[in-house]
């Protein structure tokens, strides 16, 4: 069974081969962008070997098939060939599992009957010609042998409908026919326009001139006929609202002001009123409710000018109600679900921050009720921090009641809203924030708490002492709601087969590795110890997943979702808790500590750290990957030599270190000035990786 399929499958699979060694392979690679042939890794290894007897270490290799140059420094995977090879291999395995049962006599006869029907199209040409109209000769005129066709053409011209019945049955049993209704024809056979031919018809001198076509005339045919079927000749009507003067026929049903026109519309099947959209119907109704200064008389409507100036004036009058103020008060109350992206204004600012700075409390309240995210930062500051800067107690109350994080660190100084309220000596806001759970122990980048900043202000110090002695609960930070769709990134594409990916529930979407912020990152853990062992190939991707908000889960979660789709929302049970790098120390619960820091909007690990990366590539990570990792972890990274400033504060999470870090390598020479421990911290790539995995900054050994 399936013998022919197996032979064809084997033929296709063997065709996916290396162009040099001619062996079928699934891991083929492209060398450069000039040659489009693929090579296996064994042949690539022979290319990269240094040729003997030559001084130059770089050899120029040519493709044996197309003679184009090969670039061994730019190796890219042949994804399409790999997918085809894997799919064919998987299909071959499935066919091998199928039993070798033979077809029964009835099944074999049924199959042969299908083949016989496909092999006997003897009368296909005759049936096709029967459905075609009689064509003229090559010159577009009737021949001498076509006298009997003239009668048929006259009958065709006497047809009432100007087009063929496009809704008739064109099955094999039905014959092609025209509409049965007849109409008189005033056009002779010779005056009829010839059909398309390969050679244009020559003009005749005595031929009458063709009628002038009016481009702006109605598209409905001039000759009336009784045809119950729908025709494609429908008169176009404007869809503009009735408030303007150009849409007489575009009115809602039953809203016609002229009874004569309404009567015509009901009689003419080609002039039915077009139903309006909700927005056009509402504008039409509002236009009718406006009081008119003059009584309505059956006089001619004066023609309005279509100049650019008048159109701009009318557009301003009609859209004046859509100002940012009314937009915030009316339109924002439509959606109740919370959005990550907030509304924009003419100034390009977020609507919350713009409303606070312009003291537009109604617009702020409408935006919050519409579900705008109250914790979205702009220039490093939350809307609540901006409200404290502007000393707007009412805006502060609206944002706090909507779930704004009070203890979020904002700006380059990493201060909370309570720090800013104490600096501005606003006793009302300080007392309100403390009553809602503001923390007194949080430090800023300079290491100062709120108590230390309020030493010179007795009123604020008295308020702080009052809440310090009372037993109160800090503001609880609620985790963000789960996404309706999960964007899952696989650390290794070979974790799941193509058939397993197709069986995943609809809420799970597999995304490529270059996606910025996936919701889940799937890794492989040890079955016994449940430890994630990080190798050299995936160290960069796993470090990015740890310091970002995405959840790191094991592969068992996807396999459980394939068996039971209800396991999609049980992803926290499959979170990775233990991680180890290069068979070293096992770090436990540090990934969860990173996620809590992001949720609470607290300073990240490298806050206040400045990294200098002199080498473009290190043992495990290159410079672009290091830039992304350090900046995502709250630090600064640069490839230029840093400028030493003694006023720079120390790192937030280790005040005993200097803020300047130099990333060195054992194979890279470091200048003597960077060995000064009073100004620089010499750290290795291993120290950086362990600091992220352990979520702590330790004192470097050098």
Swiss-Prot record:
<dbReference type="GO" id="GO:0070531">
    <property type="term" value="C:BRCA1-A complex"/>
</dbReference>
<feature type="repeat" description="ANK 2">
    <location>
        <begin position="379"/>
        <end position="408"/>
    </location>
</feature>
<dbReference type="InterPro" id="IPR017907">
    <property type="entry name" value="Znf_RING_CS"/>
</dbReference>
<feature type="region of interest" description="Disordered">
    <location>
        <begin position="153"/>
        <end position="205"/>
    </location>
</feature>
<keyword id="KW-0833">Ubl conjugation pathway</keyword>
<dbReference type="GO" id="GO:0061630">
    <property type="term" value="F:ubiquitin protein ligase activity"/>
</dbReference>
<feature type="repeat" description="ANK 1">
    <location>
        <begin position="347"/>
        <end position="376"/>
    </location>
</feature>
<dbReference type="GO" id="GO:0006974">
    <property type="term" value="P:DNA damage response"/>
</dbReference>
<dbReference type="InterPro" id="IPR001357">
    <property type="entry name" value="BRCT_dom"/>
</dbReference>
<dbReference type="GO" id="GO:0085020">
    <property type="term" value="P:protein K6-linked ubiquitination"/>
</dbReference>
<keyword id="KW-0539">Nucleus</keyword>
<keyword id="KW-0863">Zinc-finger</keyword>
<feature type="compositionally biased region" description="Polar residues">
    <location>
        <begin position="174"/>
        <end position="188"/>
    </location>
</feature>
<dbReference type="GO" id="GO:1905168">
    <property type="term" value="P:positive regulation of double-strand break repair via homologous recombination"/>
</dbReference>
<keyword id="KW-0479">Metal-binding</keyword>
<dbReference type="InterPro" id="IPR002110">
    <property type="entry name" value="Ankyrin_rpt"/>
</dbReference>
<dbReference type="Pfam" id="PF12796">
    <property type="entry name" value="Ank_2"/>
</dbReference>
<feature type="domain" description="BRCT">
    <location>
        <begin position="601"/>
        <end position="702"/>
    </location>
</feature>
<dbReference type="InterPro" id="IPR036420">
    <property type="entry name" value="BRCT_dom_sf"/>
</dbReference>
<keyword id="KW-0158">Chromosome</keyword>
<keyword id="KW-0862">Zinc</keyword>
<keyword id="KW-0832">Ubl conjugation</keyword>
<keyword id="KW-0677">Repeat</keyword>
<keyword id="KW-0963">Cytoplasm</keyword>
<dbReference type="InterPro" id="IPR013083">
    <property type="entry name" value="Znf_RING/FYVE/PHD"/>
</dbReference>
<comment type="subunit">
    <text>Heterodimer (via RING-type zinc finger) with brc-1 to form the core CeBCD complex. Brc-1-brd-1 heterodimer-containing CeBCD complexes bound to chromatin are activated as an E3-ubiquitin ligase in response to DNA damage. The heterodimer interacts with the recombinase rad-51 following ionizing irradiation; the interaction is direct. The heterodimer interacts the E2-ubiquitin-conjugating enzyme let-70 following ionizing irradiation. The heterodimer interacts with the pro-crossover proteins msh-5 and syp-3. Interacts with smt-3, tac-1 and ubc-9.</text>
</comment>
<dbReference type="GO" id="GO:0005694">
    <property type="term" value="C:chromosome"/>
</dbReference>
<comment type="pathway">
    <text>Protein modification; protein ubiquitination.</text>
</comment>
<dbReference type="InterPro" id="IPR036770">
    <property type="entry name" value="Ankyrin_rpt-contain_sf"/>
</dbReference>
<comment type="function">
    <text>Constituent of the CeBCD complex that possesses E3 ubiquitin-protein ligase activity. When bound to chromatin, the brc-1-brd-1 heterodimer within the CeBCD complex is inactive during normal conditions, but in response to DNA damage, the brc-1-brd-1 heterodimer associates with other proteins such as the recombinase rad-51 or the E2-ubiquitin-conjugating enzyme let-70, which activate the CeBCD complex as an E3-ubiquitin ligase.</text>
</comment>
<keyword id="KW-0227">DNA damage</keyword>
<keyword id="KW-0234">DNA repair</keyword>
<feature type="zinc finger region" description="RING-type">
    <location>
        <begin position="18"/>
        <end position="67"/>
    </location>
</feature>
<feature type="region of interest" description="Disordered">
    <location>
        <begin position="281"/>
        <end position="346"/>
    </location>
</feature>
<protein>
    <recommendedName>
        <fullName>BRCA1-associated RING domain protein 1</fullName>
        <ecNumber>2.3.2.27</ecNumber>
    </recommendedName>
</protein>
<dbReference type="InterPro" id="IPR053345">
    <property type="entry name" value="Ankyrin_repeat-containing"/>
</dbReference>
<dbReference type="GO" id="GO:0031436">
    <property type="term" value="C:BRCA1-BARD1 complex"/>
</dbReference>
<keyword id="KW-0597">Phosphoprotein</keyword>
<dbReference type="GO" id="GO:0006281">
    <property type="term" value="P:DNA repair"/>
</dbReference>
<dbReference type="GO" id="GO:0008270">
    <property type="term" value="F:zinc ion binding"/>
</dbReference>
<dbReference type="GO" id="GO:0016567">
    <property type="term" value="P:protein ubiquitination"/>
</dbReference>
<keyword id="KW-0808">Transferase</keyword>
């Amino acid at each position: 069974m399936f013998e022919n399929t197996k032979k064809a499958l084997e033929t296709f699979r063997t065709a996916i081969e290396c162009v040099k060694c001619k062996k079928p392979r699934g891991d083929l690679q492209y060398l450069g962008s000039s040659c489009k042939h693929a090579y296996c890794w064994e042949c690539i290894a022979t290319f990269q070997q240094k040729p003997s007897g030559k001084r130059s270490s770089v050899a120029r290799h040519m493709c044996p098939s197309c003679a184009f140059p090969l670039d061994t420094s730019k190796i890219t995977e042949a994804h399409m060939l790999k997918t085809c090879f894997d799919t064919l291999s998987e299909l071959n395995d499935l066919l091998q599992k199928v039993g070798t049962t033979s077809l029964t006599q009835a099944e074999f006869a049924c199959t042969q009957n299908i083949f016989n029907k496909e092999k006997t199209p003897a009368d296909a040409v005759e049936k096709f010609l029967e459905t075609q109209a009689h064509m003229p000769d090559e010159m577009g005129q009737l021949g001498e042998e076509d006298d009997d066709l003239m009668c048929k053409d006259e009958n065709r011209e006497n047809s009432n409908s100007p087009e063929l019945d496009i809704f008739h049955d064109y099955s094999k049993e039905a014959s092609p026919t025209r509409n049965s209704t007849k109409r008189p024809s005033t056009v002779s056979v010779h005056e009829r326009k010839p059909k398309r031919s390969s050679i244009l018809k020559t003009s005749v001198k005595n031929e009458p001139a063709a009628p002038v076509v009016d481009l702006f005339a109605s598209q409905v045919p001039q000759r009336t006929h009784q045809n119950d079927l729908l025709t494609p000749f429908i008169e176009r009507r404007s869809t503009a609202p009735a408030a303007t003067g150009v849409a007489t026929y575009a009115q809602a049903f039953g809203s016609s002001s002229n009874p004569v026109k309404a009567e015509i519309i009901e009689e003419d099947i080609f002039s039915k009123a077009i139903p309006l959209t909700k927005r056009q119907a509402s504008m039409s109704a509002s236009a009718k409710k406006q009081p008119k200064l003059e009584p309505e008389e059956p006089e001619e409507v004066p023609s309005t000018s279509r100049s650019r100036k008048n159109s701009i004036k009318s557009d301003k009058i009609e859209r004046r109600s859509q100002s940012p103020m009314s937009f915030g008060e009316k339109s924002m109350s439509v959606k109740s679900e919370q959005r990550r992206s907030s509304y924009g204004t003419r100034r390009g600012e977020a609507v919350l921050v713009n409303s606070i700075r312009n003291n537009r409390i109604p617009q702020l309240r409408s935006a919050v009720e519409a579900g705008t995210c109250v914790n979205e930062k702009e220039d490093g500051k939350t809307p609540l921090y901006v409200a404290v800067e502007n000393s707007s107690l009412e805006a502060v109350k609206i944002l706090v009641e909507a779930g704004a994080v009070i203890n979020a660190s904002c700006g380059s100084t990493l201060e909370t809203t309570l720090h800013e309220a104490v600096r501005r000596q606003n006793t009302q806001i300080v007392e309100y924030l403390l009553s809602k759970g503001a923390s007194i122990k949080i430090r800023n980048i300079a290491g100062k708490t709120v108590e230390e900043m309020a030493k010179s202000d007795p009123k604020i110090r008295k308020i702080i002492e009052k809440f310090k002695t009372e037993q109160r609960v800090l503001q609880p930070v609620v985790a963000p709601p789960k996404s309706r769709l999960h964007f899952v990134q696989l650390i290794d594409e070979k974790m799941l087969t193509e058939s397993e990916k197709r069986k995943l529930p609809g809420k799970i979407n597999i995304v490529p590795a270059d996606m910025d912020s996936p919701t889940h990152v799937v890794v492989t853990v040890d079955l016994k110890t449940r430890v994630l062992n990080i190798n050299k190939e995936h160290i960069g991707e796993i470090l990015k997943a740890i310091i970002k908000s995405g959840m790191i889960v094991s592969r068992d979660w996807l396999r459980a979702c394939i068996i039971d789709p209800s396991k999609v929302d049980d992803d926290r049970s499959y979170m990775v808790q233990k991680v180890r790098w290069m068979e070293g120390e096992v770090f436990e619960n540090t990934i969860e500590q990173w996620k809590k820091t992001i949720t609470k909007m607290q300073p990240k690990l490298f806050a206040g750290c400045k990294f200098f990366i002199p080498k473009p590539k290190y043992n495990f990570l290159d410079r672009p990957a290091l830039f992304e990792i350090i900046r995502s972890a709250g630090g600064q990274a640069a490839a230029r030599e840093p400028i030493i400033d003694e006023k720079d504060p120390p790192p937030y999470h280790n005040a005993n270190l200097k803020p300047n870090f130099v990333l060195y390598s054992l194979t890279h020479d470091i200048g003597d000035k960077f060995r000064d421990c009073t100004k620089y911290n010499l750290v290795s790539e291993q120290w950086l990786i362990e600091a992220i995995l352990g979520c702590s900054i330790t004192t470097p050994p050098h």
